[in-house]
Regions:
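Short beta-strand/loop turn elements enriched in aromatics
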Residues: 1-20
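Glycine- and charge-enriched low-complexity intrinsically disordered segments
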Residues: 60-99
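Short alpha-helix capping/helix-loop boundary micro-motifs
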Residues: 20-27
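Short, charged beta-turn/beta-strand-edge "cap" motif at the junction between a beta-strand
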Residues: 42-47
Length: 99
């Protein structure tokens, strides 16, 4: 399943630079291993920047260490070639802005 999500620039850049390989999110979308996160950089002034990342969910933790109704997902950012080969299967345009 593909999940389109807003993400603030600080977190977006940390993921893009491989400094962050997880996402903490409200667990309202039934995230599962193998899902894809379509992360779109978003400014608080209600606008998208055009920068996007596609990441695959590798692990989902739901437990006592999480905030109530939240989960922690281990993610892997997909490279350009993988996005190209997976895009038709998951329904993502291949002109994503950060590859």
């Amino acid at each position: 399943m593909l999940h389109e999500l807003k993400i603030y620039p600080m977190h977006f850049n940390d993921i893009l630079k491989n400094n962050k390989n997880f996402e903490v999110r409200k667990d309202d979308r039934l995230y599962e291993v193998g899902d894809y996160l379509y992360l779109r950089e978003y400014l608080p002034a209600d606008e998208y920047t055009g920068k996007e990342i596609l990441a695959k969910v590798l692990y989902v933790y739901r437990g006592e260490l999480c905030l109530q109704d939240h989960c922690i997902m281990a993610i892997e950012v997909l490279d350009w070639w993988t996005v190209q080969s997976e895009s038709k299967k998951i329904g993502v345009a291949t002109d994503m802005g950060c590859f």
